[in-house]
Regions:
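Non-catalytic signal-transmission and effector/linker regions of two-component phosphorelay proteins
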Residues: 1-23, 64, 80-82, 89-109
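A structural micro-motif
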Residues: 5, 29-30, 72-74, 85
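Short alpha-helical
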Residues: 15, 39-40, 60-61
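A generic structural motif
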Residues: 25-32, 41
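Short beta-to-alpha connector loops in regulatory alpha/beta signaling domains
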Residues: 35-36, 89
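Acidic, metal-coordinating helix/loop segments flanking the phosphotransfer/catalytic sites
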Residues: 36-52
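Short beta-strand elements of ligand-binding domains
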Residues: 55-57, 74-80
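Short amphipathic alpha-helix used as the core "switch/output" element in two-component signaling
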Residues: 59-72
């Protein structure tokens, strides 16, 4: 069974989320529903089990929680945060940073 790579985008408001999702769109992965608050983001992490999280805005607490619960998840942010794997200085860097991330491997159980 093939398993597509899933990416969760989180931003502070719907307009920023739309822009981030557009910047993160690529044929190599599937975007999950995005979130604009921590509660929804954590719910999506639990439900969708994304491989990567892209968080633009003040999401240090979310990044720390996700890193603690899912140490292997790739996390891209727009500012330095404990637990972030990469920092994008602009929306234009998001795709390249996601492409540089690890891919899931092994059987799906």
């Amino acid at each position: 069974m093939c398993r597509s790579v899933r990416v969760l985008c989180v931003a502070g408001d719907p307009e920023s989320l739309r822009a981030l999702r557009m910047a993160a769109t690529a044929a190599e992965w599937e975007l999950t529903q995005g979130a604009t608050n921590q509660t929804d983001a954590l719910g999506l992490v639990d439900a969708e089990r994304p491989h990567s999280l892209v968080a633009f805005g003040d999401w240090a607490a979310l990044v720390a929680l996700v890193r603690e619960r899912f140490p292997a998840m790739r996390i891209v942010t727009d500012r330095p945060a404990d637990g972030s794997d990469a920092v994008a200085s602009s929306l234009d860097q998001v795709r390249d940073l996601l492409r540089a991330s690890r891919r899931p491997a092994g059987p799906v159980r």
